[in-house]
Each structure stands twice: as C-alpha cells, then as structure tokens.
Amino acid sequence: VKIPRLPFDKFISAKRTLTTQMKATGEVMSICNNFEGALMKAIRSLEQHVDCLRSYDFSALSVEELLERLKIVDDQRIYVIAEAIRKGISYEQIHDITKIDLWFIDKIAILTEMEHALETQPLTVDLLKEAKRIEFPDNVIARLTGKTEEEIKKMRYDNGIKAVYKMVDTCAAEFAASTPYYYCLLYTSPSPRD
C-alpha cells in the first residue's frame, strides 16, 4: 500500500482539499500479506501521530454531516469513510458519493469491524490472532479492550504470536534476487511457511 505524505500538520494554513495540485512531500509504502494489514502499517508510517482509523475523531458528526463530509476530498477522507461505516451508512452510498471502489470500502469496513469486536467482546486468543493478522498494534488493542499494552504483549508471547520476516520476491521467482528486501508480520501459527 502506498499513501502520500501530506504535511498539513506542518503547513496548518494550507487548504487540506486535494486536487490536481501537488501537495505531497513524499509517500509511505507498506507491505503485508493482506491489504488490511498493509493499510494499517501505512497509516502508522505517516508520522502524523496516527495509529488506526480512529486517530481523527469524527464520531460527533451526525449521519447527515458525514454524508456531506464524504464529498470533501482531503487527507482525512479515509477516517471519514471509517466513521460513516461505523454509523451504518451503506457501502453503496459511500461509493456513490466518493466513487471509491466497493472493494476498498469493504477493506476499511473489516478494520472498523475489528475495532468494534475489540471494544465489545472479551479478548480471546482467536480475536487477538485475527487483530494481529490485520496488523492492529498492541497499543491500539490495549486501548480498545481496556487492557494494558503489557497485558497484550504477554498474551501474544504466551500464545506464540511473534514477528517473522518474509522476503519480497522482486524477481517473480525467475531467479534469485541479488538484493532482497523483507517485511515483518506477526505469525500466529507454529510455522511461518503456512
């Protein structure tokens, strides 16, 4: 996943709306074995003090206000879409307003569903494994479950949920890469080769 780095945190007087004018000062790229996890990693990599789709709080907006806010194309749009999903606005309605493909809206919904599950269900090993599979960081899981980050880490370690590094196949398996690069993910099975 690639996300442009839009430095509105530094240029606070700049208009946040996105048009054809160049406003990005760079980009972040993240790699995971699923889109949701890559999106979560990319959001955290923006270095804008965000760690999940709740980092910008739009919960006070009514459904009508969210529908209007969805029309604004800016750097906070993904967070508005997440809040619209939380408030029950249909994927089709979000698509009609934003013209964003339903596939992407569904992936954002998977992340909001995990937030909801972490807030409302007891934290089981299976729920923790699923949250880690889609790259929810320990601090976010702790915040949503009301536990401490140390409790989450201990639960992870006790259940064999640990980091592994996978190589990116840059040569499409035609030949061995001379300068391979790797990405990290948390594995929940005994073997990282599953």
Model-derived features: where do they sit?
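ATP-dependent carboxylate activation and anion-phosphoryl transfer catalytic cores
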Residues: 1-117, 121-127, 134-135, 163, ...
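Phosphate/diphosphate-binding loops
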Residues: 1-3, 131-153
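Intrinsically disordered, low-complexity basic tails/linkers immediately adjacent to helix-turn-helix/homeobox/MYB/SANT
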Residues: 123-138, 174-186
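C-terminal amphipathic alpha-helical interaction region
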Residues: 142-145, 151-186
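Conserved small/polar residues in nucleotide/adenosyl-binding loops
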Residues: 187-194
